[in-house]
Swiss-Prot record:
DNA-binding region: 5-24
Entry keyword annotation includes Membrane: no
NCBIfam families: ccpA
Function: Global transcriptional regulator of carbon catabolite repression (CCR) and carbon catabolite activation (CCA), which ensures optimal energy usage under diverse conditions.
Domain HTH lacI-type: 1-57
Protein name: Catabolite control protein A
UniProt keyword Metal-binding present: no
Organism: Staphylococcus aureus (strain N315)
Annotated InterPro entries: CcpA (IPR006377), HTH_LacI (IPR000843), LacI/GalR-like_sensor (IPR046335), Lambda_DNA-bd_dom_sf (IPR010982), Peripla_BP_I (IPR028082)
Xref: CDD domains: HTH_LacI
Length: 329
């Protein structure tokens, strides 16, 4: 049987308001009374309901986390950083999987608000215009972390995809690449646009043109990478930039199955740098996003908003670096 605040109050022979003050750390309670209430709480194994506590403190110490695909290793690495900081600041998280579905995402967002969470954080994916409106109207702070879609009005944490693309393109041109393709998906549309901006800028400066820009129909998966290679097979570029590691590995394996040498005949680089990049042979060259830090800094930024701390910069850009491994020359 569930123990309630009423049971604790009755056993300790105090009012429910007194129990609530003890639970919420209110100092306006005599030490003797506080000790008696805490003894009863321990003996009855009472677990205060977060929402019930929130009625007194106006805080539930819970945050809502919206993830596009919880099974994707990219998002799990973001979530790890977030969880560690949430625990450090004594917040509990309610993690919800949106399945990359904008309608489900809206439903989850409103459901989290109804649960009286203190804040909401988006991990990865793309923020739609409709979602931006909901965020701007939200009654609680919202942070987007590792999420595609720059918006000066929404607090965010990410890397600069455009600058990363410029660096990569310049390096690959120096290594002899003259033709390029870009592979991404609908769920990373904004990141793809940012990469495309940097890629085309450097190509134009060098008098080169972009070949294929392929949008995968679904999530950025291994299978979609295989499909992308099949579309390009008759007219392969010298280098392919992939938004996700899984797409890049799908392309690499397809190329090798077709007898194409990587990186001698085809160079491949990705923008995720999940653990997968070192599990394949040759190891995958990639932009190193500090995934753990993106999740951790996003959560810390949210705690600042929730606790009315001073915000130095609402749009945090973390440094990236590029690791050239076995899929580039």
């Amino acid at each position: 049987m569930t123990v309630t605040i009423y049971d604790v109050a009755r056993e300790a022979r105090v009012s429910m308001a007194t129990v609530s003050r003890v639970v919420n750390g209110n100092q306006n309670v005599k030490a003797e009374t506080k000790n008696k209430v805490n003894e009863v709480i321990k003996r009855l194994n009472y677990r205060p309901n977060a929402v019930a506590r929130g009625l007194a403190s106006k805080k539930t110490t819970t945050v809502g986390v919206i993830i596009p695909d919880i099974s994707n290793i990219y998002y799990s690495q973001l979530a790890r950083g977030l969880e560690d900081i949430a625990t450090m600041y004594k917040y509990h998280s309610i993690i919800s999987n949106s399945d990359n579905d904008p309608e489900k995402e809206k439903e989850i967002f409103n459901n989290l608000l109804s649960k009286q969470v203190d804040g909401i954080i988006f991990l990865g994916g793309t923020i739609t215009e409709e979602m931006k409106e909901l965020i701007n109207q939200s009654s609680v702070p919202v942070v987007v972390s590792g999420t595609n879609g720059k918006d000066a009005h929404i607090a965010s944490v990410n890397i600069d995809f455009t600058e990363a693309a410029k660096e990569i393109t310049g390096e690959l041109i120096e290594k002899g690449a003259k033709s390029f393709a870009l592979v991404g998906g609908e769920h990373s549309k904004k990141a793809q646009e940012d990469v495309l901006e940097g890629l085309t800028e450097v190509l134009n400066k060098n008098g080169l043109q972009l070949g294929d820009t392929l949008n995968c129909s679904g999530a950025e998966s291994y299978k979609e990478g295989v499909k992308a290679f099949a579309k390009m097979k008759g007219n392969l570029p010298d280098a392919i930039l992939c938004i996700s590691d899984e797409e890049a590995i799908g392309i690499m394996h397809s190329a090798m199955d077709a007898g194409i040498k990587v990186p001698e005949e085809l160079q491949i680089i990705s923008f995720n740098n999940t653990r997968l990049v070192e599990m394949v042979r040759p190891q995958l060259s990639s932009v190193i996003q500090p995934l753990y830090d993106i999740g951790a800094v996003g959560m810390r930024l949210l705690t600042k908003y929730m606790n009315d701390e001073k915000i130095e910069e609402p749009n945090v850009v973390l440094p990236h670096r590029i690791e050239y491994r076995g899929t580039t020359k």
